[in-house]
Amino acid sequence: MVEVFLFGIVLGLIPITLAGLFVTAYLQYRRGDQLDL
C-alpha cells in the first residue's frame, strides 16, 4: 500500500508545483513590465 500512498502524494504535489511555477513566472513577468515602464 506504500506505492499507492506515494502515488497519491505525487498526484497531489504536481498541481501545486505547476501552480507555484505559474505564479512565479507571472510575478517575474509583472515585475519585468514595471521595470520596463
From Swiss-Prot:
Instruction: State the source organism's domain of life.
Output: Eukaryota
Give a single Pfam family match.
PetG
Entry protein name: Cytochrome b6-f complex subunit 5
Cellular component GO terms held in the UniProt record = chloroplast thylakoid membrane; cytochrome b6f complex
Q: Which InterPro entries match?
A: Cyt_6/f_cplx_su5, Cyt_6/f_cplx_su5_sf
Q: What does this protein do?
A: Component of the cytochrome b6-f complex, which mediates electron transfer between photosystem II (PSII) and photosystem I (PSI), cyclic electron flow around PSI, and state transitions. PetG is required for either the stability or assembly of the cytochrome b6-f complex.
> What HAMAP family would the database entry show?
Cytb6_f_PetG (MF_00432)
* Subunit relationships: The 4 large subunits of the cytochrome b6-f complex are cytochrome b6, subunit IV (17 kDa polypeptide, PetD), cytochrome f and the Rieske protein, while the 4 small subunits are PetG, PetL, PetM and PetN. The complex functions as a dimer.
Q: Which GO terms describe its molecular function?
A: electron transporter, transferring electrons within cytochrome b6/f complex of photosystem II activity
GO BP annotations of the record are: cytochrome complex assembly; photosynthesis
TM spans, by residue?
5-25
Q: Where in the cell is it found?
A: Plastid, Chloroplast thylakoid membrane
What's the name of its gene? petG
Membrane topology classification = Single-pass membrane protein
Q: Does the keyword RNA-binding apply?
A: no
Please provide the record's keywords in A-Z order.
Chloroplast, Electron transport, Membrane, Photosynthesis, Plastid, Thylakoid, Transmembrane, Transmembrane helix, Transport
Q: What is its main location?
A: plastid
Family assignment? Belongs to the PetG family.
